[in-house]
């Protein structure tokens, strides 16, 4: 019997080793999907089902708050919003989180922002959507989806600004991580997102009582058994359909990470999984690696004035990447992603794409950064006497979806390596909306 038990334990140990040997990312997580991302570059460090379309619940509000901060541009003083009938009564029967806003109430913008963030107020989210959506919640939702498109995200569609579950309201862990990256660039957002202290909302024209909003995320409360000191800011979410969702910004020893988990069945599962993911990432990714420019160049035609003006040069800029221990600059390749032509008056969409080939040490994935464009000023000066059409007069070739990618497999460790340049033409497929996965 003892020999049988010993053999069984040995077999189980070998099985566990085999299961974990080829995987990139921590074992023993229960969440349906997760994504760990470098907050600075957007490089994915570890993931599971990161593109699966799931109900987000209240982490939806990251986009809502980001757009409100974008509109305000840090100017909150003296800005008051008036609560509409729809802000309040569209939530009737939902039994959802709120801050007891009343129709006709005049609410300072700052109070609406903190109420939506800290108290996860759905009425506050509606009010903010009207603020950046031209006066209607529907306009706010349209703005949210427009921002999704602007960020190039393919697995997100919003139907409301607060996150109450619906079949046409979904996102993915990867998309939500990118939404938070974008939101962190908006004036004032990080201040709101990282606030830990209780927030006090003074009485208003129709509410005579003072309202208090306190932090609910136990992973940010020092007295909690689930406390994680590295987490600087977070948004939690829950509905019966979505279960538990979570997005956070964490920082340790100068490394800034975004962690997203979705569809954790139990609250304690979420706590344990987030700790596991952050412990894994901070232990494995301890510092940044500077990759200088590899001197990779390409050319793009400039169109204006009814014809081609000439060409400009595009170069890879170099990048600072978060690489796992054991992964080096020699494991990174770079390519250029260029439009067929650049039309004056549009944004020059020229990118360097850095791909990490991490093997079993790091998620093999890519990150796009703006490339360096030179020669445009000289080209414009050479055509100074010519009446130049702008984007409104010339149809960009990019609308056909054609890209030219000039790729270079570069090895940093071999300075004199042969450079292999190849031109690849590919069509960008039109995105089709996918059905929600339950």
Residue ranges and their predicted role:
Residues 21-174, 178-187:
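Active-site-adjacent loops and short helices of periplasmic peptidoglycan-processing enzymes
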Residues 145-148, 426, 434-435:
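Periplasmic/cell-envelope proteins involved in peptidoglycan metabolism and beta-lactam response
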Residues 90-93, 430-436:
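Boundary segments of small protein-protein interaction reader/adaptor domains
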Residues 4-22, 404-423:
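Sec-dependent N-terminal signal peptides of Gram-positive bacterial secreted proteins and lipoproteins
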Residues 153-154, 167-170, 174-407, 419, ...:
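Domain-terminus/edge residues, biased toward the C-terminal soluble/receptor-binding domains
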């Amino acid at each position: 019997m003892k020999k049988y038990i010993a053999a069984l334990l040995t077999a189980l140990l070998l099985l566990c080793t085999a299961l974990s040997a080829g995987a990139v990312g921590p074992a023993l997580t229960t969440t349906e999907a997760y994504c760990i991302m470098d907050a600075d570059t957007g490089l994915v460090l570890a993931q599971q089902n990161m593109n699966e379309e799931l109900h987000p619940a209240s982490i939806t509000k990251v986009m809502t708050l980001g757009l409100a901060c974008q509109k305000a541009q840090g100017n909150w003083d003296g800005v008051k919003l008036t609560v509409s009938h729809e802000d309040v009564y569209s939530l009737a029967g939902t039994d959802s989180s709120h801050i007891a806003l009343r129709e006709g109430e005049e609410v300072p913008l700052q109070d609406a922002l903190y109420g939506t963030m800290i108290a996860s107020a759905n009425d506050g989210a509606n009010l903010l959507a009207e603020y950046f959506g031209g006066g209607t919640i529907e306009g706010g939702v349209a703005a949210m989806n427009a921002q999704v498109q602007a960020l190039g995200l393919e697995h997100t569609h919003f139907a409301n600004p607060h996150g109450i579950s619906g079949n046409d309201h979904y996102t993915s862990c990867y998309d939500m991580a990118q939404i938070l990256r974008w939101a962190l660039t908006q004036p004032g957002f990080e201040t709101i997102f990282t606030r830990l202290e209780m927030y006090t909302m003074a009485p208003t024209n129709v509410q005579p009582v003072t309202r208090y909003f306190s932090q609910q995320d136990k992973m940010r409360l020092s007295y909690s058994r689930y406390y994680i000191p590295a987490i600087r800011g977070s948004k939690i979410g829950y509905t019966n359909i979505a279960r538990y969702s979570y997005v956070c910004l964490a920082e340790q020893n100068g490394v800034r990470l975004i962690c997203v988990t979705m569809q954790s069945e139990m609250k304690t599962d979420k706590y344990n999984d987030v700790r596991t993911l952050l412990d894994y990432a901070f232990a494995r990714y301890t510092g940044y690696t500077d990759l200088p420019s590899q001197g990779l160049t390409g050319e793009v035609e400039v169109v204006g004035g009814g014809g081609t003006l000439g060409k400009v040069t595009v170069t890879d800029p170099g990048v600072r990447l978060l690489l796992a221990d054991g992964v080096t600059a020699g494991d990174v390749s770079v390519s250029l992603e260029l439009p067929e032509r650049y039309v004056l008056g549009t944004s020059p969409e020229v990118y360097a794409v850095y791909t990490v080939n991490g093997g079993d040490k790091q998620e093999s994935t890519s990150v796009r950064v703006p490339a360096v464009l030179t020669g445009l000023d000289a080209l414009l000066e050479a055509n100074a006497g010519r009446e130049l059409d702008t984007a409104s007069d010339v149809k960009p070739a990019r609308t056909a979806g054609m890209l030219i990618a000039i790729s270079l497999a570069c090895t940093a460790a071999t300075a004199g390596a042969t450079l292999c340049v190849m031109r690849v033409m590919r069509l960008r497929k039109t995105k089709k909306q996918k059905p929600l996965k339950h």
